[in-house]
């Protein structure tokens, strides 16, 4: 898969591009890049017990809240989210931000994001069906904190 053929998955203002899927790494890791525009407040606080998530800031600044503690992650900064930690992120800053996410083992893939995108798109600009998003999350190993 090359940069010119990478699928961009859009969930409202959020854009996700997988660089490496779990199937390509023998299940050891999945890696995706994501963009969050200024002022965006996403996603639902959640946890996952089956994998760790490491965030590497590429541009701009995102504020990640992990187990109630907010941390700004900017270019070149790293945040490790352990299994079971409740977390979420937002971009309350004036500039767009992007980051790289590394998931180990690589069990979270693009299907999760496609399904969430479908639920958000079905809302046609209105608020998405929170119960439907929760169902998608649980099906892919995420536990909503709501």
Can you describe what each PLM-predicted range is?
Residues 9-45, 51-52:
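A short glycine-rich, His/Asp/Glu-containing loop-to-beta-strand
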Residues 33-37, 47-65, 102-104:
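Short, conserved beta-strand element in jelly-roll/cupin
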Residues 8-9, 68-86:
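Short acidic-glycine-tyrosine-enriched beta hairpin
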Residues 63, 83-110:
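Ligand-binding loop in jelly-roll beta-barrel domains
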Residues 43-45, 66-71:
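Short beta-strand segments
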Residues 114-146:
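Acidic/histidine-enriched, glycine/proline-rich intrinsically disordered or flexible terminal extensions
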Residues 15, 54, 61-63, 70, ...:
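Structural motif
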């Amino acid at each position: 898969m090359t940069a010119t053929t990478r699928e961009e998955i859009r969930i409202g203002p959020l854009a996700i591009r997988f660089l490496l899927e779990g199937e390509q790494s023998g299940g050891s890791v999945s890696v995706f890049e994501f963009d969050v525009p200024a002022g965006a407040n996403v996603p639902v606080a959640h946890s996952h017990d089956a994998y760790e998530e490491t965030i590497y800031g590429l541009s701009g600044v995102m504020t990640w809240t992990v187990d109630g503690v907010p941390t700004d992650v900017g270019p070149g900064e790293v945040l490790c989210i352990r299994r079971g930690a409740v977390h979420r992120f937002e971009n309350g800053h004036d500039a767009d931000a992007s980051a790289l996410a590394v998931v180990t083992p690589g069990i979270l893939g693009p299907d999760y994001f496609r399904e969430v995108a479908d639920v958000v798109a079905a809302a046609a600009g209105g608020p998405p069906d929170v119960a439907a998003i929760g169902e998608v999350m649980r099906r892919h190993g995420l536990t909503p904190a709501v």
